[in-house]
Amino acid sequence: MINLEIPKHLKGVASMAHDIAQGMFRPISRKYDKAEHTYPSELDTLGAILQGLDEGGSQLGADGLSRKDKKKDNKNRNGRNMGTVLNVAELCWGDLGLMLTIPGQGLGNAAIAAVATPEQKERFQGKWASMAITEPGAGSDSANIQTTARLDGEEWVLNGEKIYVTCGERSDLVVVWATLDKAQGRAAIKSFVVEKGTPGLEVARLDKKLGIRASDTATILLNDCRIPRNNLLGSEEIDVKKSFAGAMKTFDNTRPAVAAMALGVAKAALDLTRELLRKEGIKAEYQESLYESHTIEAEIYRMEAEWEAARLLTLKAAWMADNNIPNSMHASMCKAKAGKSANDITLKCVELCGGLGYSEELMLEKWARDSKITDIFEGTQQIQRLIIARQLLGKSSKELR
């Protein structure tokens, strides 16, 4: 039976994350929104602090879905994946861009946690890993990746271009998706760890963005980039039956984390909007029936219901990961729901607060800009719906066209 009760130790760590969001992120949030591509030096010590909170699941995808070293038992666990979504939501209540910029907490770390061997995990421990999947000609079609990996003796040779790599300039490692054989389709797609400073790896440019400006977004070029053979994550074997399930398993961890990012930003907007409306005498405290409520109160109730639904889906996906239950469909469900809800909530909060909400006097306009990325990266709304349909109907993407 599903258990979404939050253990006491996870509540404590989430409370610490909230304190960081309030005391460290909020005061510098606007500064780095305006100073895009400037590294927030205030975060230098924070990565080390969060490493110390690892038992509470402070890392993105900290436990991984497929930890084969765990013995199966009948215990109902709420562990590090649950801790991850709780902490990420709290940190993003402070600032989503700054959360993405915390050293050692990159989306690539989740890929390593999901499919790396114990030796690889030890070798890459403590290093900040970004994720390089998207390409100019592929977009959301991950199966159409053109970046290649060719085995030459005891080295892989990588060639290709990756775009929209979050923290691609600042990270220590880049987890690159590449194909071993284009003719084999998606089954040949694997993920590789490339260390910064490796000859042939180049950060070509940084992009200007609508939101999350505290984090850098890079274009990365790979030109005969050679890495050790044991930097491949997962098996070298091309298994047509398994397709690229090993590489895709990463998303089972990162999508609930992205959903948590959306929850944090939406909660920030809701909290501030409630506070502003309360000052105007609109309390929205569930003391009257809906038909007797102020129109604005009804909007608040609707948004809070949407937020709570997204939160429960996210907690369920995390709970499934903690209990070694396949959660691909639920990871997509929570990501789709939370991303869309965050977009709707933050924009509605701007609207409810009128000119004040639209101005830079408040953070509402920034949160509306920041929230949009949660509906795009790690798979767009349309991609999530396609995945959910595939799982529910038992059909391939081609059959659903």
Regions found by a protein language model. Give the residues of each.
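Amphipathic, small/basic residue-rich leader segments at the start of a protein or domain
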Residues: 1-102, 123, 395-401
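A short core secondary-structure module
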Residues: 155, 159-203
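C-terminal helix-coil-helix/basic helical segment that borders enzyme active sites and/or dimer interfaces
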Residues: 26-37, 277-278, 282, 304-337, ...
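A short, Trp-centered hydrophobic/proline-enriched beta-strand micro-motif
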Residues: 126-135
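Glycine-rich phosphate/cofactor-binding loops in nucleotide/flavin-utilizing enzymes
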Residues: 2-3, 87, 353-401
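Short Gly/Pro-enriched turn/cap motifs at secondary-structure boundaries
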Residues: 101, 137-140, 164-166, 183, ...
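A structural signal for short hydrophobic beta-strand segments in well-ordered beta-sheet cores
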Residues: 149-150
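Glycine-rich beta->alpha junctions and the first turn(s) of the following alpha-helix
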Residues: 2-15, 204-307, 374, 399-401
